A protein has these predicted regions:
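Cofactor-binding loop segments of dinucleotide-utilizing enzymes, especially the Rossmann-like FAD-
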Residues: 9, 80, 169
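Hydrophobic anchor at the start of a short beta-strand
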Residues: 27-28, 75, 164
């Protein structure tokens, strides 16, 4: 059984944990760097990216998360989590992990009142997926190895590079678990080899 952590510093981490547990994995709410060993994957929820950076300042999260990824851990980021994963952040610039070769602009889809729900075409996810956009960021540039799995009005909103999956929307606010299930397939090899045990 895969052990998937959900960074529980802010955002709707409980909804992510519930979705993952419903798929049969062990979901762990992660609040300390010391909880990373033993995990096969980690979900970084949405919220507010500058607030998340402030909350992460109390522990060495950046080197720990980079090390987790380098050792083969799968990482999924939603909305603010996607911002944190990006190589470059603009509007305004801010620190990020650089685990995903994209340039991402904060709050590019508008204010809270501009939030919306839609259905996205995503053949690799089983046809379509439901998506909730809340002050969503915009992916402005993609590296050569980044694959677009779903787009909205021609713009990438769900991307993958190796063992990193990122989306500018909130899948945890829908009834679907397709994206969480896909992430489990990304994390499964680590679970099978036990490389983090």
């Amino acid at each position: 059984m895969a052990r998937i952590g959900v960074l529980a510093l802010q955002g709707d981490f409980e909804a992510h944990a519930k979705a993952l547990a419903g798929l049969g994995c062990e979901a762990v709410e992660v609040r300390r760097v010391a909880q990373l060993p033993g995990l096969d994957g980690l979900v970084i929820p949405g919220g507010e990216s500058t607030t998340l950076l402030n909350l992460m300042a109390d522990e060495p999260w950046f080197p720990a998360l980079k090390g987790f990824h380098k050792r083969g851990g799968a990482v999924m980021g939603t909305c603010a989590g996607a911002i944190l994963l990006a190589r470059e952040v603009v509007n305004p610039a801010q620190e990020s992990l650089g685990l995903l070769d994209v340039t991402i602009a904060r709050n590019a889809f508008g204010r809270q009142v501009d939030s919306f729900e839609t259905t996205l075409d995503a053949p690799l996810m089983g046809g379509t997926i439901e998506a909730v956009f809340i002050r969503a960021p915009r992916v402005q540039a993609l590296g050569a190895r980044v694959e677009t799995l779903a787009a909205f009005r021609g713009e990438p909103v769900l991307v993958r590079e190796g063992r990193v999956l990122a989306m500018t929307f909130h899948p945890e606010l829908t009834r679907e678990t397709k994206l969480h299930a896909h992430f489990l397939t990304m994390a499964q090899p680590a679970a099978l080899t036990g490389r983090f045990s």
